[in-house]
Design a protein with these regions (language model features):
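Solvent-exposed, flexible loop/coil segments flanking beta-strands in beta-rich domains
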Residues: 116-175, 253-320, 380-407
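Beta-strand-rich globular domains of non-transmembrane regions
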Residues: 206-266
């Protein structure tokens, strides 16, 4: 009778390999990987391996389980319980457990029709209007240390131009660790091209004011900035882009020719994207100086001089940054959570995109709390034993910036 029962189940098309509650690749796992991993882990991407199909995911499943359970991947610093963002990459405990259950139940394939169309790589991507390359390829020759370089890239724009998006493309994903793009409208910083952060000449150039200190910041997986329709960021005629690249150590000669893609605003720009940078000079408990073997906290209380609609934000510190929190208090007393980073990681800085523009009225107070760890217990401390650290562009100096892109 038992044999006949199983025979009947097979005739009815029941899959005896798994139940309806058993996770499958197409229904449960592929959407998680697509939304949170494939931007880096794809062919030509920045991850060390691809996760674009079932076999690739199965081959790396133990690694995936380990790095997701530890919180190492996906790399996302902001606390989602404090504020959720459009471009967040975050796996909750349910998703992490689902991946592990899929492995434990035999990594069933499931039905392809169950696949949710969440793959960001399949979304229509417009063609760039202008691609700007470094003036010449930079050669790293057996450098066993971190390498921080400045490059000057003239835009040669014939007129003031509004851009709706900007994208950085590393020329050598094996050595380009992260980058930052700034704007100079004076054309007086062109001599910085190819100089190290530590070159005395570059220190002189750093004294000159910039039109934009943070046009865009890139780390692996950071999405291109896309401003809302009807808005645009103005790049002035003949302005230069200052590209700051961090190269990872290499054991052999490597070459990099990175590029920047600009996407012009096609429709009428009714609202210009502006940049507000709250910086070290706005700190209430001056001076901005971090003594060796201390963990100081700095505070900012910044009053908005106009009403704004925030499109995106970018906190910025260097290696001894430890935590960063921003809260806004409106004139009516409403508290608006902006961002909370409990454990800062210099290597995974991001531009955080709001799901919809966040309105803040004039006279709103932006409260910033930033803590630094200049002790030997900080594994990212560039100085062992610790040294006194002050403000500076160099990555071994420190900064405390909160950049707001708004209209």
């Amino acid at each position: 009778m038992k044999t006949n029962f199983y025979f009947i189940l097979l005739l009815l098309g029941v899959d005896l390999g798994y139940s309806q509650n058993t996770p499958t690749y197409y229904k449960d796992i592929a959407p998680i990987i697509s939304e949170n991993c494939m931007e880096c882990h794809s062919y030509g991407g920045l991850g060390p391996f691809s996760l674009t199909n079932l076999e690739e995911v199965k081959s790396k499943i133990k690694t995936i389980i380990a790095v997701t359970k530890s919180g190492y991947m996906p790399p996302w610093q902001a606390d989602p319980s404090f504020r959720s963002f459009e471009n967040e990459r975050f796996l909750d405990s349910t998703s992490i457990k689902r991946i592990e259950n899929w492995y434990q139940t035999g990594m069933k394939k499931g039905k392809k029709k169950d696949l949710m169309n969440s793959n960001k790589l399949d979304r229509v991507k417009p063609k760039e209007d202008l691609t700007l390359f470094m003036n010449e390829a930079y050669v790293l020759s057996n450098k066993s240390e971190e390498d921080y370089r400045f490059f000057n890239i003239p835009t040669n724009l014939p007129e003031d131009t509004y851009i709706r998006s900007i994208e950085f493309i590393p020329g050598n994903k094996g050595v380009v660790h992260h980058s930052r793009i700034m704007v100079d409208t004076t054309n007086q910083i062109r001599g910085i091209d190819g100089l190290s952060e530590y070159d005395p000449k570059s220190l002189e150039y750093q004294k000159l004011p910039l039109a934009d200190e943070f046009l865009y910041g890139w780390v692996p997986g950071n999405v291109p900035v896309l401003y809302p329709q009807g808005t645009g960021k103005k790049l002035f005629k003949n302005s230069d882009l200052i590209l700051n690249i961090h190269y990872a150590p290499t054991s052999k000669s490597e070459t990099d020719l990175s590029r920047i893609k600009l996407y012009f605003a096609k429709e009428k720009v009714d609202k210009e994207i502006k940049v507000l940078t709250i910086r070290e000079g706005d700190i209430a408990n001056q001076p901005f100086f971090i003594r060796a073997n201390t963990k100081p906290t700095f505070y900012v209380s910044y009053s908005l001089k106009e009403s704004i609609n925030m499109v995106s934000i970018m906190p910025h510190m260097h290696f001894i940054g430890d935590s960063f929190k921003v809260l806004a208090v409106t004139p009516s007393g409403d508290a608006v959570p902006i961002i909370k980073i409990d454990k800062w990681d210099f290597n995974w800085q991001s531009t955080y995109l709001f799901k919809k523009p966040q309105y803040l009225p004039k006279d709103t107070i932006i409260l910033i709390t930033a803590t630094y760890d200049n002790t030997i217990s900080n594994p990212e401390n560039p100085n062992i034993p610790p040294k006194d650290i002050a403000y500076g562009w160099d990555s071994t100096d420190e900064m405390m910036n909160f950049i707001i892109y708004y209209y």
